[in-house]
Amino acid sequence: MNFVLFCFLVWQFVNPGAAFDIKGRLDLKVRNVSRHDISRTYFNLYRIRNPNDDSEWDSYSQSSKLENINGEFTFSDVPIDTGINRTTYFTLHSHSNEFNLKPNRILIQIVGNGQDQEPNLSAFENRFGREYFPSPDITYPETLNPLPLDSANRLTITTMNKQPYRKYIKIRNPGILESGPIASVLRSKFKLAGVVTVIFLVLFPILLEKFDPETAKAMRQEKMHRENAKYVSK
């Protein structure tokens, strides 16, 4: 029994790697997360090789989906190096069929503090084309902005303000109120005002004749007098 315990301690000393959970949350801002969003949103995590580490390295990847309507997701038992000041890098890719997520690429940096201590996790807003570069300190073309973690030490992913939704279905035959001359009139304030004026001029005599025939008769007589006055003056 003592020999088994001794071998276990030696293995822990030689191989300081351990499992770690990376947690995140999706914040839609415009509304709450729905069951439909859960089925159409997912995240991929890839480990990046540290160029300063000459030890044996194996590729690693993991996928995760939203767990609940709070937008939470977790990458469980992610292998990291817990040695003191030993750094492990990951890149996180965000995918959704409904939204344009921000940041779409995240560089995750985990620095070990020893076998019995919680490692330090830092995140940076990454960009397309350099998501597999394992360092936030690159000076060309630009440095990466830190991504703040929330009170529960989770990554926060949001939607882009200018393009929050994606439309994959285009209506081939829209209604008359959405396309054509009628839609053009309804979308233009000046055209709509002109049409309303013409309709009013056409309907006003008819409505006046129906609801106030005496006034309509007086107006016709006044018009006849003006016409007769023109001929008399000539």
From Swiss-Prot:
Domain of life per record: Eukaryota
Compartment annotation: Endoplasmic reticulum membrane
Keyword Transport: yes
This protein's GO CC annotations: endoplasmic reticulum membrane
Membrane topology annotation: Single-pass type I membrane protein
Glycosylation site residues: N32, N85, N120
Main location group: endoplasmic reticulum
Name of the protein in its database record: Protein SOP4
